[in-house]
Amino acid sequence: MNIAIIGAGPGGLITALRLQQQGFAPTIYETVPELKPLGVGVDIKVYGLKEIEEIGLLEEFRMMSVDAVDSVFYNHFGQEIYAEKCGVHMGYEHEQRFVHRGELQMLFYRTVQKRLGKDAIVLGARVGSYEQDNAGVTLHLEHRDGRSESVRHDAVIAADGINSVVRKQMHPELSEPHYSGITMYRGTTLREPYRDGHTILHIGDPRISSMIVYPIADNFEGSGKTLVNWVVEAERDESVEDWNQLGSVDEILPFYESVDIDFLDVQQLIADAREVYLFPLIRHEPLETWVDGRVVLLGDAAHAMYPRGGNGVCQAFLDARVVAEQLAAHSDPHTAFLAYDEARRVPVNRIVMNMRGEGYEVIRRMVAERTEGRPLADRADIEGVLPLAEADELFSNYHRLVGQPLRAGHDTYSSGFRTWEAEAVPGSAISEAAVLAPAPAEAPRGESAL
């Protein structure tokens, strides 16, 4: 089967690698004339690591990424409200890891070239539209040198991102997205490691502004320092839906004047940014089908979601595996695509809607509302505002929703703590032995939404 993939982002590239595992030799068409390691950080969840391992790139990925150990939440004053372990440190099968999106993309790019050949990726070729009949699909290409070309394939997988040309042709009635009123400011800062060098921080009152901070590279470019990724959400006039739109820190610094975290100067972190990118939170309505005959959508083209929680890229990894498996199982691409759609669309749409509602980040809003936006008189007062048991239930529901795979013998999805109550290991959030101890046999195991 002669398969085309539109888009050489992480989703399109890993799809090519999954297809190669099934015996296919796809061709990728990419608009840009040269792939470069652009962008900022991404949070690769446990289930995403599993997919990377299955394509044989886990060790290389580990070398370029940072293991996530702790996830800690703070109110608008820098007071801790909740913490949990991450990945294998919580009892999951794989790590959760932080990485620069561009470096991840380049790892996949090099691997595609190695396994499929350099001719497998056609750069500088924009897909303008498609036509199809009972025998195949015709893609109409516009090359950077001004040439127009039409190419023929048996099947087409569109992984052409949030501004997907294929999605607009397939669903013209849903082509206009809706701006949420919120813009993400995404930056990276080179600095000394904070805390243990393996912690993701969630800071702020979402009614004012939210901030996420995590390391994405140790000893960056031999500097001995850590490259730290940060993301700020704030209200702003609508801007272009483009990952590479540059912004300024001056618009967001005032939001964090009251934040006081003993191991991190948040305002200095923002001010020292190497670059800042703007990205508006755009609402794309969930689709009723990803399939049009021999053409199918994948990744952001199929299920663009608010980029919270690291699920956008990781869900594309799952898409890639399932679509490759179905194409290997069915000689008719339309039948294969329908089976893929049936397996993936409904559960992913649930995640899309959950991310639209803040996901687990809602706990910071809950605390802000319950305290009426005031600081806690004492850090221990947080248990009366947000009991650990209540937060644990919320986080467990989220982990089930996205399908985090538990390690054998572990039957719970979340066990929160407060870092100041740590006893066993100085400088660590909590004893890993306590976190990794198997749960009682009678504890119910949540079923994966996937």
Where are the language model's segments positioned?
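Conserved N-terminal glycine-rich FAD pyrophosphate-binding loop of Rossmann-like flavoproteins
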Residues: 34-50
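Conserved mid-domain beta->alpha element of the FAD-binding
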Residues: 6-23, 29, 157-158, 185, ...
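Residues at the starts of beta-strands that form the adenosine-phosphate
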Residues: 2, 25, 227
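C-terminal helical "tail/cap" subdomain of flavin- and related membrane-associated enzymes
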Residues: 78, 309, 325-450
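Conserved FAD/dinucleotide-binding core of flavoprotein oxidoreductases
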Residues: 80-105, 109, 143-150, 190-278
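Conserved Rossmann-like nucleotide-cofactor binding loop
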Residues: 11, 34, 163
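Conserved N-terminal helical subregion
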Residues: 1-3, 20, 47-171, 175-188, ...
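Acidic/histidine metal-binding catalytic segments
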Residues: 63-64, 120, 258-275, 333-338, ...
